[in-house]
């Protein structure tokens, strides 16, 4: 008789404990119910990137002096700088400049150490393509400024601010 009573008491304690755990889970679910959703509808909504976001590199051909500092500071020696020495004026003349974004790690060293500020980071991050050879940008492709997502009226922009707990 006594073992049956103790089993019944254990069953009651286990039932109470299970109900408490279910109640705790339900309270957590209810606490998240009044929060804004975290997900965005990507093609139609985009987050505004921070001002220090490291996206695609923008290149200004006229400012470049072909010093090759960008190649020396790049951890993977990525930028390809073709230049010709002008003997009459004893200066380098830039012929071609290209970066392969399929290999680039977007560290930003080239932008940081460029003495003439001809390189800058943009907010463009949509670089996907079906052919990897299309990711090799020459000076013409690097010179194009991307359209700002704030200016695009077809896309709803969402400001990504951290929540402040009060």
From Swiss-Prot:
Primary localisation category: plastid
Record-linked Pfam families: Fer4_7
Source species, domain of life: Eukaryota
Boundaries of every 4Fe-4S ferredoxin-type domain copy: 55-84, 95-124
Family under the similarity heading: Belongs to the complex I 23 kDa subunit family.
Protein's job: NDH shuttles electrons from NAD(P)H:plastoquinone, via FMN and iron-sulfur (Fe-S) centers, to quinones in the photosynthetic chain and possibly in a chloroplast respiratory chain. The immediate electron acceptor for the enzyme in this species is believed to be plastoquinone. Couples the redox reaction to proton translocation, and thus conserves the redox energy in a proton gradient.
UniProt subunit comment: NDH is composed of at least 16 different subunits, 5 of which are encoded in the nucleus.
Protein name: NAD(P)H-quinone oxidoreductase subunit I, chloroplastic
């Amino acid at each position: 008789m006594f073992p049956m009573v103790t089993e019944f008491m254990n069953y009651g304690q286990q039932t109470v404990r299970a109900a408490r755990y279910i109640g705790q889970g339900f309270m957590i679910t209810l606490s998240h119910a009044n929060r804004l959703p975290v997900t965005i509808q990507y093609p139609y909504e985009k987050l505004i990137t921070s001002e220090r976001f490291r996206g695609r590199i923008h290149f200004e051909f006229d400012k470049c002096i072909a010093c090759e500092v960008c190649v020396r500071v790049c951890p993977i020696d990525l930028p390809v700088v073709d230049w010709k020495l002008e003997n009459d004026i004893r200066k380098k003349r830039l012929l071609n400049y290209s970066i392969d974004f399929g290999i680039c790690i977007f560290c930003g060293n080239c932008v940081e150490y460029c003495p003439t500020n001809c390189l800058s980071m943009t907010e463009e991050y949509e670089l996907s393509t079906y052919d990897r050879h299309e990711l090799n940008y020459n000076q013409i492709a690097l010179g194009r400024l991307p359209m700002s997502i704030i200016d695009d009226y077809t896309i709803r922009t969402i400001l990504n601010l951290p929540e402040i707990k009060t």
